[in-house]
Amino acid sequence: MLGLMILLSFLSGTFTGCEKDDSLLVMFWNMENFFDYRDGGEGPSDKDFSSFGKRRWTKRRFHVKCDLASKAVMWVADHYGKMPDIIGLCEVENANVLHKWLDNTLLGKIDYGIVHYDSGDRRGIDVALLYDKSRFGYVHSSVTVPRHDGEAMKTRDILEVCLDRSGKNIHFIVNHHPSKFGGAIRSGPKRQSVMKTLAMICDSISCADRNARIVAMGDFNDNPDGEQFDMLEGILVNQSLALYERGEGTIRFQGKWDLIDMFFVSPSVSICSYMEIVKVPFLMVRDNTYTGFKPFRTYSGPRYIGGVSDHCPIVLIMKMKQ
């Protein structure tokens, strides 16, 4: 039964018109503290996630996570008949982690390019993007540091990567917005500030090219009905609404699903698109407290569990406009 839990959303109608052969497959995943096992002296989180740190994050545990994560990507490839063209990631320590992940798993067989910048985040985690170099040409990339009350925020940068596909540019934007730690009301203004930054980035791209192709993805730490998403109205289309209306989600808290990982696309980017949430058995574990199933995370508090992430990965399938 669990093996059938692939949640479909026909946001552009049906599968018709989004054939696999001519589609773009994008994957996004919050990797839950994807740290190296060495203490590089980059802050308290880096020290905790080391062989002798509080989390006892050993080489073996790191490679278990790498293997399970690559298994998930390969499952996506098998299910859709192709490897993901783009993989957006968040909660990644640094580019070295990504190189190790690619070099030591089956993902190394694909020539993925890595785009990553170190941010000023307090936890020492960043966003990143992988792209299939056989299908895309690198054009440029940049990061924008969100500001709140006139000061740079100690949070994740917003990553924008422009890639060329068949002579046409596509702008991929990767986000990881502030959490609700400390309370939703108290933390809300910071999420609003980051969302405002995202809207400004998209507006700037659109002003330079009114037919700009934009795909934004990320962990937005809010459900699709959050007021902050009104800032993107008229610029990007939320691909997660139908899933959310059916009660689906990417993270489970106290027995309730929240859909905080999403894709947004500009109207000019595709003639059809739909989003799915990946809930295959090896990424899930039984919820003994609230019944049902939940994501198989790496840690529960300080206790090592052995999974990949407390988030389910999401995929976006699009047929591009010519």
Task: State what each model feature region is.
Residues 200-214, 221-322:
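Metal-dependent phosphoester-hydrolase catalytic domains
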Residues 94-96, 122-124, 180-182, 221-227, ...:
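Active-site environment of divalent metal-dependent phosphoester hydrolases
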Residues 52-62, 83-89, 116-117, 147-149, ...:
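Second-shell loop/turn segments in exported
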Residues 86, 92-171, 177:
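Structured beta-strand-rich core segments of catalytic domains in phosphoester-bond hydrolases
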Residues 15-105, 115-119, 125, 196, ...:
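N-terminal, active-site-proximal structural segment of metallo-dependent hydrolase catalytic domains
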